[in-house]
């Protein structure tokens, strides 16, 4: 275990809390220099430039990060946004949005996410390929300017971003996590896209369910394109989702008012910049499903879905709204539908492609090493349970009962 610890000197900056200064990355990473920023405003021009001209996901939009900082970052947490530049030319190569927070009497460096970013990926300056060597050199530069911490814990690292290798996934300490994400490419005519890209069994079930919904008073995909519709349809999403999760005995982030406010405000902002879209699927006068999406260039990210499973018997509203949104997305010019993180069976049923997410979880100090090892052991335990269906069912039922007992009445 001790061999995994990194020297604290590599993490110490000697800066005041709001000071930002460039640091050489050391002999091992002479190709890059890094600069620590402790406010969003300090990096706003560069962030917006990389967002529009570089490579990133919809989870790395500046406005998304701004909402996280304004409403979700814990009071005792510090922003640690690192700008990495080419040492020879001075040109920016990437922006790495991190934060430092207190966790059980030690400090941890995490992604600037607070639970509302499915993916952890730097904003890259361009599509220039990264190698393991260049990624390690850039990461050494990042570490050289971060504030003192006991461990690194970054989850949800996709292997690629926009077809470019994610530098974080190339690092030696990066390991496959127990989580995966799914996506499906969309091309050709919108009217036939579902039939062409999805599995025949999914298409058959989808068409059958759509006919049943249509017989229930007519079928309509409603976009929340006004402030009133955003409030109404998003409110329905929260209501249906919390009801469903209570029924399943599961916890949902939307049980926290600040998280609800974050998503609602992002949806209102999306009316102007198109970064967020909300759709409801209505059968007659009944809203049977709601989908919350983020949009970036040609990609639609499915972030939140809520369904009323009992509204129409023997129908899967979730599959129906997914099918309708694939058609809508292709018609609107999108070429990739990201089904986000989670191993739900409907994703494979559709024909989406699975990709395993990586994570960085390692200690810098002995205290951090101990905490990181505990997290890894817990992850192995979860993976073991998931790989044993009977054991998983028992564990799931136990957790559902436990959460119901703890839920307010």
Pin down the residues of each PLM region:
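Acyl-donor binding region in acyl/amide transferases
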Residues: 79, 101-177, 295-355, 362
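Short linear elements at protein peripheries
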Residues: 397-409
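Active-site/acyl-donor-binding loops of N-acyltransferases
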Residues: 2-33, 159-197, 332-394, 409
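Short beta-strand-to-loop capping motifs
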Residues: 124-127, 184-187, 225
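A conserved beta-strand-loop-helix scaffold within acyl/acetyltransferase catalytic domains
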Residues: 30-110, 157-181, 189, 194-313
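Short intrinsically disordered coil segments
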Residues: 113, 137-139, 196-203, 374-380
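Low-complexity, flexible helical/coil segments
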Residues: 69-72, 117-122, 130-135, 187-194, ...
């Amino acid at each position: 275990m001790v061999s995994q610890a990194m020297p604290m000197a590599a993490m110490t900056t000697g800066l005041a809390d709001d000071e930002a200064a460039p640091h050489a990355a050391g002999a091992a990473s002479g190709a890059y220099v890094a600069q620590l920023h402790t406010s969003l405003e300090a990096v706003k021009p560069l962030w917006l430039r990389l967002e529009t001209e570089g490579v990133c996901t919809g989870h790395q939009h500046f406005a998304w990060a701004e909402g996280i900082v304004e409403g979700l970052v814990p009071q005792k947490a510090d922003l640690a946004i690192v700008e990495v530049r080419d040492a020879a030319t001075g040109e920016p190569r990437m922006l790495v949005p991190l934060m430092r927070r207190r966790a059980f009497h030690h400090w941890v460096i995490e992604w600037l996410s607070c639970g509302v970013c499915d993916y952890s990926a730097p904003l890259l300056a361009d599509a220039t390929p990264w190698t393991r060597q260049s990624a390690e050199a850039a990461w050494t530069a990042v570490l050289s300017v971060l504030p003192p911490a006991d461990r690194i814990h970054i989850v949800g690292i996709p292997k690629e971003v926009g077809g470019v290798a994610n530098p974080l996934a190339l690092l030696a300490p990066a390991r496959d996590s127990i989580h995966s994400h799914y996506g499906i490419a969309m091309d050709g005519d919108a009217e036939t896209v579902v039939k062409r890209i999805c599995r025949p069994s999914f298409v058959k079930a989808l068409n059958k369910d759509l006919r049943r919904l249509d017989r229930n008073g007519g079928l309509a995909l409603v976009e929340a394109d006004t402030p009133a519709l955003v409030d109404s349809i998003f409110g329905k999403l929260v209501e249906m989702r919390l009801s469903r999760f209570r029924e399943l005995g599961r916890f949902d982030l939307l049980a926290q008012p600040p998280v609800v406010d974050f998503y609602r405000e992002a949806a209102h902002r999306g009316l102007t910049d198109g970064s967020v879209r909300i759709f409801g699927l209505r059968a007659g006068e009944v809203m049977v499903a709601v989908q919350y999406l983020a949009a970036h260039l040609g990609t639609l990210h499915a972030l939140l879905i809520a369904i009323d499973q009992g509204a129409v018997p023997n129908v899967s509203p979730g599959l129906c709204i997914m099918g309708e949104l694939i058609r809508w997305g292709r018609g609107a010019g999108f070429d990739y539908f990201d089904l986000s993180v989670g191993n739900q069976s409907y994703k494979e049923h559709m024909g989406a492609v699975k990709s395993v997410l990586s994570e960085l979880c390692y200690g810098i100090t002995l205290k951090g090493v101990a905490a990181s090892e505990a997290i890894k052991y817990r992850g192995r335990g979860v993976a073991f349970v998931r790989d044993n269906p009977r054991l998983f069912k028992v564990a799931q039922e136990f957790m559902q009962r436990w959460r119901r007992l703890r839920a307010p009445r």
